[in-house]
Design a protein with these regions (language model features):
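Membrane-proximal helix-turn-helix segments that form the acceptor-binding/catalytic region
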Residues: 106, 126, 130-134, 138, ...
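A short helix/loop element that forms part of the nucleotide-sugar donor recognition site in Leloir-type
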Residues: 62-66, 216-230
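N-terminal subdomain of nucleotide-sugar transferases
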Residues: 1-73, 259, 402, 422
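Nucleotide-sugar-dependent
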Residues: 247, 296-305, 312-333, 339-351
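Carbohydrate-associated surface elements
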Residues: 53, 187, 206-209
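Nucleotide-activated donor-binding/catalytic signature segment of Leloir-type glycosyltransferases, i.e.
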Residues: 264, 270-271, 276-303
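Conserved donor-binding/catalytic core segment of Leloir-type glycosyltransferases
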Residues: 231-247, 253-256, 268
Length: 422
């Protein structure tokens, strides 16, 4: 029997605020995930969202300033919505939405409320922590990326430099101020415990989920995208998702070059990110006949494009274990696809692929090992098929309902243990 959710009184459910740059109608990962979590909890809590106008995939769409959607009260705070692909524009967007969210939150949040915030953009959790402290709310920190580790692993900051050390000091205080820290995997829990000095008792592992109803394996020969691109007769290796500094696309470019003479193998990229222009330029520079780079596809088209391959590849640079857990992994599993995981051996991604026998694990940066994994997958169609079946079975264990239930238990535990203020 499900434990009753915490309530401020028998008549009125406790308020749960969600602070996020991205929310519906944004379909990018963070916006989609926060929307589903908020709506899933709206049957038990008075859920209220403070967010921005669309600046990512839905940029240009002017959403209502205030609305109630699926039981959630949404307030879209004013900010700039400039083209985020221009770095200075992205910075302006972040700074204006941070200021706007703080202004609305400081007059809206009350003592005893819950305040859920995600770690992206990295300034936002500090704003939420300030509001929680001033207003007497309980801060819930949802970790999608660990800072400054994500910046040092990608080479954007020297690991031992002054700025990285200062950010570490600030982050440690942020994490220690949270009533609960929610992480996406076992490796992330270990990192937060050691790097941030947070007790394991105050950390909850709540993974993301697979949309197993909308996404499932389909017949390859009938895949519309493969037909459109003329790839029905190719062995297709797909990379779908963000293409950022942490994703080690350089080793993929090397693998494509080494396999260029193999006319049966084709690399299909779908997504966007800061490294996408570099990848497109590299494909042109090397005149690779075995690669195609496409832009973002609507979330509603995932059934089609996630099935448009024989195997998927997820890559990270070295040092990303515990720093980030790829949300794309779960829907890839739902599509019944094996995975080549280019990742640290102790990362959540690598451990899952290895323990569940879902594909191949390759150390970051090892181009030759990627080539060998692709060739091994192509030579063993029956093994690949078995991996796909196991992938689908694993995906069934990661449902949205189980995630929402985990959040309910977390919130109930806070109140029953007397950790709530006020």
């Amino acid at each position: 029997m499900r434990e009753a959710p915490p309530q401020a009184s028998s008549a009125q459910p406790r308020r749960l605020w969600v602070l996020s740059e991205l929310y519906y109608p944004e379909e990018t990962s963070t916006g989609y995930l926060l929307t589903r979590i908020a709506e899933g909890l709206a049957t038990d809590f008075d859920v209220r969202v403070l967010c921005s106008q669309p600046t990512y995939a839905s940029r240009g769409l002017r959403a209502l300033g205030t609305e109630v959607r699926n039981g959630v009260r949404i307030r879209r705070c004013p900010s700039t919505t400039l083209d985020r692909t221009v770095r200075v524009h992205r910075l302006l967007n972040v700074l204006t939405i941070i200021a706007s969210l703080w202004a609305f939150a400081i007059v809206s949040v009350r003592r005893g409320d819950y305040l859920l915030v995600v770690t992206n953009p990295p300034l936002l959790p500090f704003v939420a922590a300030t509001v929680a402290w001033l207003r007497g709310a309980s801060l819930l920190l949802l970790v999608h990326d660990v800072y400054p580790d994500v910046l040092t692993a990608s080479g954007l900051l020297p690991r031992t430099g002054f700025l990285a050390r200062r950010l570490r000091w600030l982050s440690q205080r942020l994490y220690r101020s949270a009533r609960r820290t929610i992480v996406l995997g076992r490796d992330m829990k270990r990192l937060v415990e050691t790097a941030m000095g947070v007790s394991g008792d105050s950390i909850a592992i709540i993974p993301n989920w697979a949309d197993t109803e909308a996404i499932h394996p389909t017949k390859r020969a009938e895949n519309a995208l493969l037909v459109e691109l003329g790839l029905i007769d190719k062995f297709v290796v797909q990379y779908a998702g963000n293409m950022g500094y942490t994703h080690g696309l350089e080793c993929l470019a090397g693998a494509m070059e080494k396999l260029r003479s193999d006319e049966d193998v084709f690399f299909l990229f779908i997504g966007s990110g800061t490294k996408k222009p570099w990848l497109e330029a590299k494909v042109r520079e090397l005149e690779l006949p075995n690669a195609r780079v496409l832009g973002n596809r609507p979330r509603g088209d995932q059934l089609n494009f996630l099935n448009a391959c024989d195997i998927t590849i997820i890559t990270f640079v070295a040092g990303m274990a515990g720093v980030s857990v790829p949300s794309r992994m779960y829907n890839i599993l739902a599509a019944g696809k094996a995975i080549i995981a280019v990742a640290d051996q102790d990362s959540e991604l690598a451990v899952m692929v290895r323990d569940e026998r879902l594909g191949w694990v390759v150390p970051p940066g090892e181009t030759n090992s990627i080539v060998q994994a692709v060739q091994a997958a192509r030579r063993q169609p029956e093994v690949l098929l078995d991996m796909g079946r196991r992938a689908r079975a694993v995906a069934e264990r990661y449902s949205l309902s189980s995630v929402i239930e985990a959040y309910r238990r977390l919130l109930a535990g806070l109140e029953s243990s007397g950790m709530m203020k006020g």
